[in-house]
Amino acid sequence: MTDNNNLDSLIIDKDEYLNSPMNVVDKLFKFDQNNLNNGTVYKKFENVISEDQIYKSIPLVSTINQCDLNSGKLVKIRCMIQDIFDPQFCPSFNKIKNIETNEIRLEASKYKDKINLNDCEELIFDSFDSSTFDKTILYCIPIPCENKWVNNNNNNNNNNNNNNNNNNNNNNNNGNEQISSSLLNKKKRNIDDADMKNENDEENKKSKDQKSTTTTTTTTSKEGEEEGEEGEQLTKSKKLLTNNKIDINKIFNYPIPIDSNDENNLKTPFIVNIYDDDIIFDENNKAVTFKINEIIEFVGVVAKFNPTLQHQSSNSSDQGETTTTIIDLMSMLDVDEISTIPDTLIPQFHAITYRYLDPYKFNHLNPFSIDTNTTINNNNNNNNNNNNNNNNNNNNNNNNNNNNNNPNNNNPNNNNLNNNLIRNELIKFIKLFIVDELLSEYLLFHLISKVYSFTSGLSIGNFSMNISIPNDKEFQRLPQLIELLYEILLARSYRFSMSLENLNDMDVVPYKDYDRNRIVSGLLQLPKGTNLILDETQLTEGKVESQGIKVLNALNTLSIQQKVEYDFKYHPIEIQTDLPTISISFGKSLIKGTTQISINKSIQLPTINEINQQLIHSYNNDKLNQFRNYINHCKNLSFKISSPTTTTIAESDDATRHIQEDFVKSRQLDSKMTTDVFHYWLTLSRLVALSFNDQYIKIDKWNIMKSLEEKRKLTINNL
């Protein structure tokens, strides 16, 4: 074992940790070979990056271009675990022999994917002196359903961290333009059939052009070299996404189809190599294990992506070696375990340490709360004073103050008066999209809802909604309007068009492909806290096949129980999740929900242009961030059964008695009243209380809930 006192004598500059991390690993290995296996490497790095400013300065990479530009440096990737491969056993170091001098040297093999051999060196394969280790291999994809404002903020933060301040002055000014031009125009095309037709014609034309472009190889593209490395890499990524011979969603195993014309979708998945999987511990001092669908930020080294391979042509032996692009390669490969072809399809990432990200926490500075204070094995992270990182990974009590670093001082936790003001403004903002005031209240509750416990088969806190609309063209754009609203306010959301084709043909339920030994992703493989909009208005007459029936059953199970049964062929694997669902249908919904509401038939929904004008003139980025912070605060506010202070215990006890008496009275008036209804009332009253910044149910909030319910029932009776 390494003597800590001796190790302290090894002085390594902080800049070397950030700019040449592999040099640090090599120095630690040369100092003592045991440093590779006793946790010294990640402990030394944690000592450095536990400083908040240093951690923020580490570049966040997400595209192939960014990976290549930062190759060899310490970088971060933020992603979702889509699959966990079988562990690999590897030697801790390799013996390398100099053929000319017979000198033998040792080289560390951890955190690397290649062996550095000189011309006169060879690898000694029959050496058994090296101790072995098993590394965990994760397949990680870009966080699904992430909305554009999150990507924009991440990019802005990344620019700030890299001292690219020249563009920062335009960030706030471009916020409304981004919403109006990117989100709103997209929705306008979705609603307007004529525009959709024109758009499809343009895309078909682009597709033909891109198809002809992809036939050229990278070796003959001198023009690409003149455009620079960044332009070349973007071209490769776009070729990969738009190639007609392959289904990139299948290759990359994305749960939802991606739009190849959207530059935000140039993000790449990663194969993440984990060398120390006992870094983070729970409150019981047990190592936290990796699970699929979790969002994690890894810190480590990314291997330089190599999109071309040298191979021997099978058709003509006299041609010798030829260079094949990744496009051509993927079109002829039968993709087996993706971990066997990492250099050709997906960049390799060697993780030194990592942070679990809370899927429920976001604000406009950093969309997720990074858990730098989660228990680290050497306890060197506990000095991190970042307010945004004060939450333990497994802490579900939602004691959250990650809005305290908001420079606009829009934290709704300041006082109830400020909170109520923001609440009223947010209701007004929601009404801008859907007009109906009662529906706006229930949408607010849906926005701040989350499952906080699974007990006896119940998902406590689940608040799934059914919205019934008249079979009228006037109301057919409601799903798109709610989609736009959610894209502006939430970090992650997705509208699933429940057309007959999608039900019968689209991968919705993830399943295990035993031939390729991987989980094939589906729509329901999403991180917790992703809001799903189920658009039943797209359903037309036709036959629902067995696959479609399976999809409907899965959506119903998700909506009510918040669980997804992954199809492992011989037996289902039940995965608990939290994907708040909202279904919109003409009349009665095919998807069960915890509540149903009908929109007011007398209202007139706004057009996209009308919303656009309102957003531009009335809502700037600061105001939108205030709404996002309010939702984040309410979603993560610690809720208690009774008052936490002695001064209001009497008030809390009175509320408890009032609730009990009200339920007894309700059962006396209606013999059909069940405990399920009472559970729903408790859930709804809890959301009402949280929306007013109350941490327990008060009598007035219970009465507000009952009043809202009476109005909601009237809308259902009018169906």
From Swiss-Prot:
Which InterPro entries does the record cross-reference, listed alphabetically? MCM_complex-bd
Single biological process term from Gene Ontology: DNA-templated DNA replication
Give the main localization category: nucleus
Please give an example of a GO cellular component term from this record.
Answer: nucleus
List, in alphabetical order, the Gene Ontology terms for molecular function in this entry: chromatin binding
Give the compositionally biased regions (Basic and acidic residues). 194-211
Alphabetical keyword list: Cell cycle, Cell division, DNA replication, Mitosis, Nucleus
| UniProt subcellular location | Nucleus
Listed Low complexity bias regions: 152-174, 212-221, 377-416
Q: Where is this region: Disordered?
A: 152-179, 194-236, 375-416
> Out of the domains of life, which is the source?
Eukaryota
Q: Which Pfam families match?
A: MCM_bind
Q: What is stated as this protein's family in its record?
A: Belongs to the MCMBP family.
**Subunit-structure text:** Interacts with the MCM complex.
| Job of this protein | Associated component of the MCM complex that acts as a regulator of DNA replication. Binds to the MCM complex during late S phase and may act by promoting the disassembly of the MCM complex from chromatin.
Write down what this protein is called: Mini-chromosome maintenance complex-binding protein
Encoding gene, per UniProt annotation: mcmbp
